[in-house]
Design a protein with these regions (language model features):
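Contiguous, structured surface segment used for ligand recognition
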Residues: 1-113
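Generic structural signal for residues positioned in beta-strands
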Residues: 4, 37, 52, 61, ...
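Aromatic-lined carbohydrate-binding surfaces of glycoside hydrolases
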Residues: 9-15, 29, 47, 112-398, ...
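Short, hydrophobic/amphipathic alpha-helical patches that form generic packing surfaces
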Residues: 19-24, 68-83, 138, 454-466, ...
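Short, solvent-exposed alpha-helical surface patches in well-structured domains
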Residues: 72, 258-259, 489
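Catalytic domains of carbohydrate-active enzymes that cleave complex glycans
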Residues: 437, 462-612
Length: 612
C-alpha cells in the first residue's frame, strides 16, 4: 500500500509527524494494496494539548491544537491501531500487521494536564537520552527537564563508568556535554516538546564556582571577593560541607541578589528557546544563612523577593520566560510577608522528596497546620498529610499554575521488585492532582527505570494525558504486549513480588534492623529462586530476557537486604558485593534496562550497606 501525508502547515514537527505516520503504517500495511492519504492540520487554540482523528479506509485527517498535538495525535492513532511503545528502546516496540479495514477511526482527545514530563537523573549514555526523548510523545508526555546548565553529571557518570570496576572509564568533558546537549535540544525542538532547564547550580555560580560536578565535594574554597555572599552557617562562610551545589547564600546582601538576578536574566536572554527556566536555591537543608540580617526574615520571603527582582528585570527587557519556583526543603515553609507580584510569570513546583511511596496521597489526611519553622533545625515531612499541608500553605499565598515534581522512580522504585505497586501508586497520585490544585507532574527519575519493565512510566504517561483512564486496563495492556503467550506467568510472578515491596526500607526509612522486613525480603528472594527455572523456558524476546535478568538481580538484592534487616552486617556486605559483581558483569547486555550506577548508589548510601 502507498502511504502518504499532506499538510499546509510548514512546521518541522508536523512534517515529522507525517513521516512517522507513513513509516509505521508502511510496516503495518505491508500486505495491503491501494493508497492511504492523511492530511495533517493545526487548528490553534488555547488550553492543553488536543487532537482529533478522522480516518476512513483510504485516508482522513489528524488535526492538533498545536504542532506537538499533531504528533501526539499520530502516535495515539498508531496506538489505536495496535502499536505499543513499551520502552524507549526501539527493539521493544510492538508494531502489528493489520488489514485495511482496521484503519477507520473517529475520536478526539484533550490532555488532562498541562505539565506532563520527566527530569533527567541517574547515569546516561547520550543514546539513552536520545531514545528517551524520542519515546516521550509516544507515551503521551510533552516535556523534558535537563537539569543544571548542562546535564554533564548525569552523562559523566555513565562515560566514567562509576560504580562498575569491570569497565574502563572513558574521557568525557564539558565540551562533550555541550555537544550532546545541543543534540538533545534539537530532538526536543523537532517534536515541539517543552524544554525545562537549569534548577540546581545558580547558588554555586553566584559564588564563582561551577555546579557541573553535581553534588560532589570540591577542594577549592570560595574566593575572598565572593565570601560575603555565602551563607553564614555555624559561624563560618564557605562551601557547605565542601559542596557548591548545596551551598546557600546570604540574601540580605544586596550584591547577592544583584548577582543572582543578573545571572538568571543573562541566561534567559541567551536562551529564548527554554520554555520553563527553573530558579532554585541550594540543595540540601539546614544550610541557611544565620547572619543577623538574614535572621530578621525567612529564606522563603527572601526567595520570593529574589524572584520578584528577576521578574522586574525580565519585564524591563521584554522577556516572557516562564520561571519555575520550588517548594522543597526549607522552601516548603511559605513566606510570611512577601508575595509574587506577577503570578502569571511563575509556575509552582511542589517537590515532596521525603514522602512515602508505600501508599498514595490521601487528601483526607491533610493537616490543618504546618510545624513552626526553626532556622537550620528543620525535620523534613515524611507523612503524605504533612507534605500536603505545606502545599496548601503555599497555595493560600499563590493561586497560579503549578505541578508536582515527584520521585517514585528516583529511589523508592528499586524496593518494588514487581513494579506493579509503584505503577499503581503513580496512577492513584495522578488521579488526585486536580483535587490538589496542580496542573501536572514531572517525574525526577532514572531514564533507565526499566527493570523488570517500563510499566510505571507507561502508566504515568497514559494517566497524565487521560486522568480518567483505568490503571488496571493500562497494566493489562502493557503486560500482554510485553509478555505475549505467557502473560499470566509474568503477571502472577510480578504481582507476588509487588506484594513483598519494601519501597520505604530500601529508601532508608525506618530502622535498619527489622525482623518483619527480614522475613518479607527472605520471601522475595525465595520467590525469585523458585521462579528461576520457569523463566529459563520462556521465549527469548527482549522483555522476557530482561525479566530473567531482573529475577537474578532481585534474588541477590533481596538476600543482601535480608541480611541487613537481620543485623548480620558481614553477610549483608558480602551479599551486596555479589549483587555488584552480577549486575556489573551483565551491564553490557542489559544497559538499556537497568541503571547499574544508580541501583548501587542508592543501596549503598540510602538502604544502608555503607554502614556495614
Amino acid at each position: 500500500m502507498k502511504i502518504e501525508f499532506v499538510t499546509t502547515h510548514a512546521h518541522q514537527t508536523v512534517t515529522f509527524a507525517g513521516e512517522e505516520l507513513c513509516s509505521y503504517l508502511q510496516r503495518m500495511l505491508c500486505r495491503e494494496e491501494g493508497r492511504f492519504s492523511v492530511s495533517l492540520a493545526v487548528e490553534p487554540r488555547e488550553g492543553n494539548d488536543a487532537f482529533r482523528v478522522e480516518t476512513g479506509p483510504s485516508g482522513g485527517t489528524i488535526t492538533g491544537s498545536n504542532p506537538r498535538s499533531v504528533l501526539l495525535g499520530v502516535y495515539d492513532y498508531l496506538h489505536h491501531l495496535g502499536c505499543r511503545f513499551l520502552t524507549p528502546m526501539p527493539q521493544t516496540e510492538v508494531v502489528p500487521e493489520i488489514p485495511r479495514d482496521r484503519l477507520p477511526a473517529r475520536y478526539e482527545k484533550q490532555a488532562s494536564f498541562r505539565h506532563r514530563g520527566v527530569c533527567i537523573e541517574g547515569a546516561n549514555a547520550a543514546q539513552n537520552v536520545l531514545d528517551f526523548i524520542r519515546w516521550l510523545p509516544k507515551a503521551g508526555f510533552n516535556s523534558f527537564f535537563l537539569q543544571f546548565r548542562l546535564p554533564y553529571t548525569f552523562l559523566a557518570r555513565w562515560y566514567h563508568h562509576m560504580e562498575n570496576p569491570l569497565r574502563e572509564p572513558e574521557a568525557y568533558t564539558l565540551a562533550d556535554a555541550e555537544v550532546h546537549t545541543a543534540l538533545f535540544e534539537r530532538e526536543l525542538q523537532k517534536r515541539s516538546l517543552l524544554l525545562h532547564k537549569v534548577g540546581h547550580g545558580w547558588t554555586a555560580e553566584v559564588l564563582g564556582s561551577s555546579a557541573m560536578g553535581g553534588w560532589n565535594a570540591v577542594e577549592e574554597t570560595v574566593a575572598a571577593e565572593n565570601l560575603d555572599m555565602a551563607a553564614l552557617v555555624d559561624g563560618k562562610r564557605g562551601f557547605f560541607q565542601g559542596v557548591p551545589t548545596n551551598t546557600s547564600l546570604c540574601f540580605s546582601n544586596p550584591r547577592t541578589v544583584d548577582t543572582f538576578a543578573e545571572r538568571v536574566v543573562s541566561y534567559a536572554r541567551r536562551n529564548p528557546h527554554v520554555d520553563c527556566l527553573h530558579v532554585w536555591l541550594a540543595d540540601g537543608f539546614n544550610n541557611i544563612c544565620e547572619c543577623a540580617s538574614c535572621q530578621k526574615t525567612t529564606v522563603s520571603d527572601q526567595y520570593v523577593q529574589l524572584l520578584n527582582e528577576i521578574d522586574r528585570r525580565l519585564t524591563a527587557e521584554g522577556l516572557g520566560t516562564k520561571l519555575v519556583f520550588l517548594l522543597y526543603q526549607e522552601l516548603l515553609w511559605p513566606p510570611i510577608r512577601a508575595r509574587l507580584r506577577s503570578p502569571d510569570r511563575f509556575v509552582l513546583m511542589f517537590a515532596p522528596i521525603t514522602r512515602t511511596f508505600e501508599r498514595s496521597y490521601d487528601l483526607s489526611e491533610v493537616r490543618s497546620s504546618i510545624p513552626e519553622y526553626v532556622r537550620n533545625r528543620i525535620t523534613l515531612p515524611t507523612s503524605l498529610g504533612e507534605n500536603l499541608a505545606f502545599l496548601r500553605s503555599w497555595q493560600a499565598r499563590y493561586d497560579g499554575d503549578g505541578f508536582v515534581f515527584d520521585y517514585p522512580l528516583g529511589r523508592a522504585h528499586y524496593g518494588d521488585f514487581g513494579y506493579l505497586h509503584i505503577a499503581r501508586i503513580i496512577g492513584q497520585d495522578i488521579k488526585k492532582l486536580r483535587q490538589m490544585g496542580l496542573n501536572g507532574y514531572l517525574s525526577c527519575q532514572e531514564l533507565r527505570a526499566c527493570s523488570p519493565n517500563m510499566l510505571p512510566d507507561y502508566v504515568m504517561g497514559a494517566l497524565l494525558f487521560e486522568e480518567n483512564a483505568d490503571v488496571e486496563e493500562r497494566i493489562t495492556e502493557y503486560l500482554e504486549a510485553a509478555y505475549p503467550g505467557r502473560t499470566r506467568l509474568a503477571r502472577d510472578y510480578l504481582e507476588r513480588l509487588s506484594e513483598l515491596e519494601v519501597c520505604d526500607y530500601l529508601n532508608g526509612k525506618g530502622p535498619r534492623v527489622d525482623p518483619d522486613m527480614a522475613r518479607k525480603l527472605s520471601a522475595a528472594a525465595g520467590l525469585c529462586e523458585q521462579m528461576e527455572q520457569q523463566l529459563d523456558s520462556v521465549p527469548d524476546t527482549p522483555h522476557w530476557k530482561a525479566l530473567r535478568h531482573h529475577n537474578r538481580c532481585i534474588a541477590h538484592l533481596a538476600r543482601a537486604m535480608e541480611a541487613l534487616a537481620s543485623g548480620d552486617r558481614e553477610a549483608a556486605l558480602r551479599l551486596h558485593r555479589q549483587l555488584r559483581e552480577y549486575i556489573c558483569r551483565m551491564e553490557p547486555e542489559f544497559q538499556g534496562w537497568l541503571d547499574v550506577y544508580r541501583l548501587l548508589d542508592v543501596t549503598w548510601n540510602y538502604t544502608g550497606f555503607r554502614a556495614c
